[in-house]
């Protein structure tokens, strides 16, 4: 019985933690989901963005007190503009998706929303990209990855 309780807590901690992608694994996944070159944004730039936004973690969240909104998932997509978390005042829900879905281990919905965002606002919609990736050599983010 004790072993079952310990095993239950282990599974619970994995479910709460989410998936933290390995860099090349994420590169392959993003390429498969059509982000490489999407709207002129290279795969290396997407990897740089996700590294600085979430450290490749699907369950990452960040509360923004000034806007009373939260950033969700591997792309840190904001609940004020892009997803519905049921608690952000005057939310727009531009991607027509639940914020919870943006934190799934299967990142297809998060990628679809990121595509929508970059189509409307460009890659500069992400502050981390402007701070850490723009005007930098980002080639190291895909270096050594078998794509």
Swiss-Prot record:
What Pfam families would the database entry show? Lys
Q: Where, by tissue, is this protein expressed?
A: Stomach-specific.
Q: GO biological process: any one?
A: defense response to Gram-positive bacterium
Which PROSITE patterns does the record match to this protein?
A: GLYCOSYL_HYDROL_F22_1 (PS00128), GLYCOSYL_HYDROL_F22_2 (PS51348)
- Enumerate the spans annotated as C-type lysozyme domain: 19-147
Recorded catalytic activity of this chain's protein: Hydrolysis of (1->4)-beta-linkages between N-acetylmuramic acid and N-acetyl-D-glucosamine residues in a peptidoglycan and between N-acetyl-D-glucosamine residues in chitodextrins
**Disulfide pattern:** 24-145, 48-133, 83-99, 95-113
UniProt-listed SUPFAM superfamilies: Lysozyme-like
| Phosphoprotein listed as a keyword | no
Alphabetical keyword list: Antimicrobial, Bacteriolytic enzyme, Digestion, Disulfide bond, Glycosidase, Hydrolase, Signal
Q: Which SMART domains match?
A: LYZ1
Active-site residues, Swiss-Prot/TrEMBL: 53, 71
Tell me the outcome of changing residue 17 to K.
In isozyme 2C
What is the additional note? Lysozyme C is capable of both hydrolysis and transglycosylation; it also shows a slight esterase activity. It acts rapidly on both peptide-substituted and unsubstituted peptidoglycan, and slowly on chitin oligosaccharides. The ruminant gastric lysozymes, which digest symbiotic bacteria coming with cud from the rumen, are much more resistant to inactivation by pepsin than are other lysozymes.
Protein family membership = Belongs to the glycosyl hydrolase 22 family.
Under the heading PANTHER family, the entry gives: LYSOZYME C
Quote the protein name from its UniProt record: Lysozyme C
